[in-house]
Every structure is written in structure tokens, then in C-alpha cells.
């Protein structure tokens, strides 16, 4: 991952949101969150065109009763053109909002 360490990026996802640029688009990772009413952890990733004001669509969403499971799925599910996060992170640039 350009502009940061992958381990730090992943650690941050457990406490906050993060963004990356990949293939010319901006992707906003909503960190692992907990829904008190439903007693579920959840996360999602939104795709934007050039900047945070040009929302395109949600590309990923996952819910679980377990925080670690939620993070594992976020990183290992194949929603990046049939690849998982670990397979494409080397082409991503960590960016500030």
C-alpha cells in the first residue's frame, strides 16, 4: 500500500474510517462499527469517482456477531474485481479525507 503500512491501515479499521485511491477512484472504508440495537458488528465500503462528493455506489457490506469475523470478511471477501483486499492493496494509495 502506497503512503502507509498495511498493518497500520488494518489496525485503524477497528477504530475509525479510512480511504484509499484505487484504479482512479476513491474508496471509503467504514471501520468496524457496532449496532447496539441489533447487537451486530458491521462494515461497508463506498466507491466515489474523483472525490468524496461524487458518490457512485456501495460496493461492499458485511454484518456479524463477531468483530474479528467482520474484519476478516472485509479483508478476505473477493469484491475487488474478483480479488480480496490483500491481492489488490499493493495497487492502493492510502489517502486523507
Q: Where on the chain are the PLM-derived regions?
A:
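Short acidic DE-rich linear segments
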Residues: 92-97
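Negatively charged, low-complexity tracts enriched in Asp/Glu with abundant Ser/Thr
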Residues: 1-22
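Acidic, low-complexity, intrinsically disordered interaction modules
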Residues: 26-86
Amino acid at each position: 500500500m502506497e503512503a502507509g503500512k498495511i498493518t497500520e491501515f488494518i489496525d485503524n479499521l477497528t477504530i475509525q474510517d479510512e480511504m484509499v485511491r484505487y484504479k482512479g477512484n476513491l474508496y471509503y472504508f467504514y471501520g468496524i462499527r457496532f449496532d447496539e440495537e441489533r447487537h451486530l458488528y458491521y462494515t461497508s465500503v463506498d466507491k466515489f469517482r474523483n472525490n468524496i462528493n461524487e458518490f457512485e455506489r456501495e460496493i461492499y457490506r458485511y454484518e456479524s456477531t463477531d468483530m474479528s469475523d467482520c474484519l476478516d470478511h472485509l479483508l478476505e471477501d473477493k469484491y475487488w474485481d474478483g480479488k480480496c483486499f490483500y491481492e489488490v492493496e499493493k495497487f492502493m494509495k492510502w489517502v486523507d479525507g
